[in-house]
Amino acid sequence: MQHLRPHPTEVAEKKNIAKKFELRRSDAFHYAFNPHDYVDADFFNYNGTPPKLYAGLRYALRYVQKPVIFFTGYDVGPNDILNAFVRHVVCSLAVREGDHINIYFFDMRNLRDISPSMQSSMEAEFSKHAGVPVHLVNSACVDRSKCVYLQRFKGDTEFGWCIGWALFFLEYLTGTPSFLQKSPLDKKKAIADLYTKVDRRLSEPRSNHFIEAYYIHLMGL
């Protein structure tokens, strides 16, 4: 399978961070973005190192009433084919709904595939900083018995395109502020519709070119 280049990991991190800041296109959201790191909430679930949350995100989870957008990173683990330790990044949206916060987690896999306790551990960490219960809504799994794995056509020798996917979902959210007016149930329906449409586009050619072309065009490369 041929892949388009440059790969996101071949682009300077500061350029990826700059694009993330550039996509802050709606004042309906609060953007808890670390100016020095692509990831704002970092979970080191593989070796048990304590999580690291950007100070601006910790403050926003507790005090900001607007929906908060940030990027979450976590460990996938060692990959023998790539001879590398793989990490993953996910665009995340925290919304106060009732007496709790729902974090809409625009991932592409079931977190139980990483670890049975991973989701509950992340929820506990976010809740600690928010001061209220936090529930993680895995966007890949809202409307199907089997989660939608949007990276299934990337091939065994590729990693890092999650950098592009995080920007894709960020642009979707900032370009669709009406999403925030929906009920929690209707938010899930809108997410399921988005994932289904993207999944169909991926499935027709059975390639990873959708996100590759998106990222390269977005970055002007």
Predicted segments — roles?
Residues V64-T174:
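Cysteine protease-like catalytic core of ubiquitin/ubiquitin-like
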Residues R24, Y59-Y63, H129-V132, T176, ...:
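Surface-exposed polar/charged interaction patches
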Residues M1-C91, R96-I103:
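Cysteine protease catalytic domains with a Cys-His-Asp triad
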Residues N138-G220:
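C-terminal folded domains that constitute the principal catalytic or ligand-binding module
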Residues R5, A12-F21, S127, I191-Y195, ...:
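Residue-level detector of alpha-helical secondary structure
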Residues A55, Y59, S120-K128, A213:
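Charged/polar, solvent-exposed surface patches and flexible loops
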